[in-house]
Amino acid sequence: MNVQLRMPFPEFLALIGVMMAVGALSLDMMLPALGVMGDELGITDPNDRQQVITAFLLGIGIGQLFYGPLSDLYGRKRMLLIGLGIFIAASLWATVAHSFEAMLAARALQGFGAAAPRVISAAVVRDCFVGDRMARVMSFAMLVFIAVPIFASALGMLVLLAGDWPAIFLFTAAFALVLALWSGFRLPETHAGDAGHGNRGPFRRLLHASGIVLRT
């Protein structure tokens, strides 16, 4: 499907870049804080601290199975905003986590929410463009995705110096909130959803994705 884009192309490009940045930013900003966070949560083994990263990757991996079919059924913007809401709630939960288990749960949920902008950004681009222009937009999006980790750790260190490790989660929550407001007010709905039109294809894909998760 190729829909008309009703926003300036440079703004659309910037918005897609920010959507792609959410997952990479929230993953790499935490790296400088693993030591102090582990100490406060009573985790002395450096290998155990790495589970904070693993939990996030697990959440984002599972989330990517679901947001594509769900956005086909219920619309791109709705699922994007739901995913960002989950991400923000999980980020705030992480700021008050008083046990390592709670932190792992919050990070997994944060990853699940971060999967929404990652998946839906690509779907929106496919809705709006075809051919060479789609390839150029996706190339820019992937460039942002690759470039963000280069400075995310340094940004995490700056936030850590200005505050404590929960401030990193507050930063990512604020970043996602800005994205949610920007998307909610400016991003046009590029695919309204098939749930009310008897289209069972996305539903079958969702069931298939659920089966993969359950089997693994």
Language-model segments: residues:
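Helix-breaking motifs and short loop linkers at transmembrane-helix boundaries and internal kinks
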Residues: 43, 75, 96-102, 113, ...
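Helix-loop-helix hairpin linking two adjacent transmembrane segments in secondary transporters
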Residues: 102, 131, 136-192
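Extracellular/periplasmic helix-loop-helix junction of adjacent transmembrane segments
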Residues: 33-62
